[in-house]
Amino acid sequence: MTANAIVELELDDIQGGALRERPSPYVGTYVLLRIDDQQAGRQMLRRLLPVIDAGPTSSDPAKDAWVSVALTYQGLKALGVPPDSLASFAPEFVQGMAARAELLGDVGENGPDSWEKPLGTPEVHVGLAALSPSAEKLATVLERARRAYTELPGVTVIWRQDCYQLPTGRNPFGFKDGIGQPAVEGSGVPRSNSKEPPLKAGEFILGYPDETGSLPPMPKPEVLGRNGTYLVFQKFHTRVAAYRQYLRANASSLEEEALLGAKMVGRWQSGAPLTLCPDRDDPELGADPSRNNDFLYYEDDLRGFNCPAGSHARRMNPRDALKDDTSVDVRLHRMIRRGTTYGPMLPEGVLEDDGADRGIAFVFVGAHLKRQFEFVKSQWVNDGIFIGASQENDPLVGPNDGTGTFTIPHRPIRRRLHGLPSFVVTRGGEYFFVPGLRALRWLAELET
């Protein structure tokens, strides 16, 4: 198979949650399980198989309600996966997120010692995720999943997080999210950016060529690795009041507050990109999925006068802005991102923290943990060398400590914000493997 050959994904073997878009509106639940008995764990997988849908079966995500199952390295061990198979997984996955925390910048209040237990501990074996466009459909699909692990003494629920779309349809900071997902070749999901070709399937699903033209390393045997992928789960607490206070202190009007927030994020609250509408929000553009992601940076905004190079959106996906830098290929560092909110919304205009826990449960999907998630987090989110600002990190989700800065290009004189505090705190996370359906059957039928 040549590097330019278009592959056909075996969608009937790929868990739907790997490629399917998040419904909108949505409600969801994440459940973590511990396997105390090997046979009970395998029995649970056999029961779960009929509940799990394959592939992005609907072009309308509002119609979908689905469940996905994922396993940690410790979970695979608990199921009795042979040592040679365990050794074939990515080293980052084997170590687990807690062991990689320092590399990821999760230290101090963001470090594993401060995480919400059992996140980041060896007790986390299985992760279930359910997303639905309605509470009724979620309850139905959750009940089907619940029957798979109840009445099994050797399987224990150890954690649960419920999520739902806020009444505004936006994230806790007030911004529309879920925009700018990469197009995956062969997935059947239409691309939202006509200026970028779809990414090779092997960037996201194991068993297919990636952007280098090679097959990514895959767990063995082939039945276990093929059509699987890696998944990163993280829970973030958001300091919404601190974010609003910072904007208020650095702006002279509500209009300037909105502009500063947009400069930090890279989009207006409606989702409209600064690159296309730099001066004022355009809700109609923000609501149009055929236009709100259809842009590049190199020709239109290379210097960041519209959308700062250090903004959150541009750090997560620099698009073509780095094409003159031969040391980096942005297409090797893309991820499928899926965020869901938890906790109550802080009422509009409130500047004081009410003490409620609110935030985002984030999922990142990709075939390469190290050069996708870990690279983006350590090199683009937590560092600014690649944009010529080595002392700056992501103004919204970076590990700022009250001394952070953020540069806003402007003619004739740039503006630099000072004293950035932390607006996001890591509450925990884990690395998972999302097996294909045949792999789940293989795991369920393992012999001791």
Where in this protein do the model-derived segments appear?
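Long, low-complexity, Ser/Thr/Gly/Pro-rich intrinsically disordered segments that act as flexible linkers
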Residues: 1-448
